């Protein structure tokens, strides 16, 4: 029995070594250090209007209004090649396609400045941060979408819109929006808060389906839909408010719909 066990262990070790060798030989060569920080500017075809931004992984994005569409990427020189920026059907896609994260230091920048004058839709699947340097647009935007599919970074946008649509479906991203909107529609299903106290909305709808809170500043009419998990806090000076609780209160109910001031 001892001999059989020893032979089995030796077989396992041999199999493990073979699998590791196959894995290493099949992997494409990749630098194991980040390299010194460098900045690269990427230009795009002037004839293409970019209206949407999709970004992923650990990329930090700053939106800057400018007439010339371009991006500036700052990261380690050994990582730059695998920071991809592709344009398809009016959308810019930003991804970090570097491999072997576990072999590198995590202390490196991965910052992308997006210079634009036409982005009106953002799709966020990231653990990086998103912010605007000043207003996303000096002109009033007819419609703006912020869609958080999943993420855990900080989002901070200054907006001036006729209609604003915020949908947060999963993750722990903290969302802060400031500015003005004629109509704001917020859906919250994540484990953090949405702060729209400094976004003055004429009319608004706030719907929460998870833990966390929505803070909304509405002056005219607010529709607030909550459950017993999350809370909606609103400006008490709103002219009209309709409150709906979608689930019956539980014994340990924490969710409320009430003024924040």
Q: Residue spans of the language-model regions?
A:
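Short carbohydrate-recognition loop motifs
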Residues: 91-97
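A broad, low-specificity signal marking well-ordered, structured residues that form hydrophobic/aromatic
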Residues: 5, 71, 83, 92, ...
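Sec-dependent bacterial lipoprotein signal peptides
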Residues: 1-25
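Solvent-exposed adhesion/ligand-recognition segments of exported proteins
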Residues: 56, 83-89
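Short acidic/polar N-terminal linker immediately downstream of export determinants
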Residues: 11, 22, 26-79, 97-115, ...
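Extended, compositionally simple hydrophobic/Ser/Thr-rich segments
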Residues: 50-63, 112, 119-261
């Amino acid at each position: 029995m001892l001999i059989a066990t020893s032979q089995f262990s030796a077989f396992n070790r041999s199999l493990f070594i073979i699998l590791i060798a196959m894995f290493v030989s099949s992997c494409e060569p990749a630098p194991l250090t980040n390299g010194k920080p460098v900045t690269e500017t990427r230009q795009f075809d002037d004839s293409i209007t970019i209206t949407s931004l999709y970004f992923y992984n650990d990329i930090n994005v700053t939106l800057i209004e400018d007439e010339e569409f371009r991006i500036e990427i700052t990261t380690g020189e050994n990582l730059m090649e695998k920071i991809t920026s592709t344009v398809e059907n009016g959308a810019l896609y930003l991804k970090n396609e570097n491999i072997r994260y576990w072999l590198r230091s995590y202390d490196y920048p991965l910052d992308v400045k997006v210079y634009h004058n036409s982005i009106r839709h953002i799709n966020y699947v990231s653990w990086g941060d998103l912010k605007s340097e000043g207003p996303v647009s000096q002109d009033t935007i007819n419609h703006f979408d912020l869609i958080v599919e999943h993420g855990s970074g900080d989002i901070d946008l200054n907006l001036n819109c006729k209609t604003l649509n915020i949908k947060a479906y999963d993750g722990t991203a903290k969302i802060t929006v400031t500015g003005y909107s004629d109509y704001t529609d917020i859906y919250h299903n994540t484990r953090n808060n949405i702060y729209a106290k400094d976004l003055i909305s004429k009319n608004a709808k706030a719907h929460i389906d998870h833990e966390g809170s929505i803070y909304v500043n509405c002056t005219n009419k607010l529709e607030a839909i909550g459950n017993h998990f999350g809370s909606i806090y609103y400006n008490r000076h709103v002219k009209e408010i309709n409150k709906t609780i979608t689930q019956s209160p539980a014994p340990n109910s924490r969710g409320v719909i009430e003024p924040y001031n």
